Amino acid sequence: MKNKLARLILTSSIVVAPNVSAVELYDDGTNNVTIGGFIDARVIHTQGQTEIVNGASRISFDFSRKLKNQWTALALLEWGVNPVGSSDILYNNRFESIQDEFLYNRLGYVGIAHEKYGQVTVGKQWGAWYDVVYSTNYSLVWDGNAAGVYTYNKDDGAINGTGRGDKLLQYRNNYGDFSFVAQVQFKNNDFYTCDIEAISESACQTLWENGSNIAQQVEFNSTYGAAVTYSVNTDLKLTAGFNRGELNVNYTSGRLQSVNDFIYGAGVTWGNFDSKGIYFSANINKNENHDTDNLGRLIKDAVGLESLLSYRFENDIRTFVAYNIFDAGTDYVIQPNFNADPNDNFKRQFSVFGIHYLFDADTIVYIEARKDFSDFTSADKEQEYQMGLSEDDGIAIGFHYTL
């Protein structure tokens, strides 16, 4: 039974950060504190620019305390760290790219776990949906951005609870070869979307308050979701899950539109990305009113697919290729935006090829390249250009140091 509790807490930790190990700082037999995280910096060339940028560096503190009757209290705090300063290139995850503070919040939750009754946590944490799709998220430079995790133009998924969800109440447990997670996101908050690439929310809010027709106010209510993982054997895992919420879109014209945010899908994984030999993972999803295009316009419905094939050789060189597509087709914008031509097309599609050299499990030098095949065809060529800007081809060389 002790092994089950350890596996339960470990499963939660893996979902929190699949590439992060930890170092024990303190253990008195009752209380335990570990520190984890990594520093990643890279030189990237994309969008006609070359810069040194941060690679989603982070630091975390993991706390646990043994209680009576086989209960364990636990907590985690994680901050993003920006060791290189601000960047003008928005090439991947918008949440990470726009950060110019040295420290910023990524995760923070507290909870309780039992070897039989499972684990309950409260706070900002990886959503249940991430259990379904995280196994394709191993490129160090370019996320897939097709799995419905980093929603609202590549943000951190906090709004609808599919990424690092805000205000989540989550339950996890294991039964035999099955593990499952269920969650509720208790919140009511407003945010703003604008038909402009790379605009801050405060600037977008100002446009809304001034009555601009390129700005909308979104009222997002509570969400809920669940996921299940079936370990067929030591190599093969199957996943499935969903997430659902409700939102209201307010327009400066006075119009109010109520819609459901819904995503569901499944995934398959073979092997272990960090082990020698072959690794493969793929997932597919169908979503409605779940994400926005690269100009912040809510997408009516789309299909997303992510896949990754990797091989680690005996000489500790690891190669991989990833293919990702997020296809909304034409006439995909539900909002009556002034620039929403029904013939506009949205298809995010690209491949990533990478070579990693592992000095050891925690020290990696890498090169990754992205080739874009997206289709953002529009009669408005300036809009088409803006839509494709952050999807450009690119190449990056970096160093990844895990604590």
PLM regions and their residue ranges:
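Detector for outer-membrane/organellar transmembrane beta-barrel domains
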Residues: A226-F353, Y357
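Outer membrane beta-barrel
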Residues: E24-I39, H45-N188, T229-V232
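Outer-membrane beta-barrel "beta-signal"
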Residues: Y175, Y357-F359, L389-L403
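Hydrophobic, lipid-facing positions within transmembrane beta-strands of outer-membrane proteins
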Residues: G55-I59, R106-V110, G165-L169, S222-A226, ...
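Gram-negative bacterial Sec-dependent N-terminal signal peptides
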Residues: M1-V23
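Transmembrane beta-strands of outer-membrane beta-barrel pores
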Residues: A41-H45, W79-P83, W126-A128, Y175-D177, ...
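Transmembrane beta-strands of outer-membrane beta-barrel proteins
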Residues: V33-A41, N69, A73-L77, V120, ...
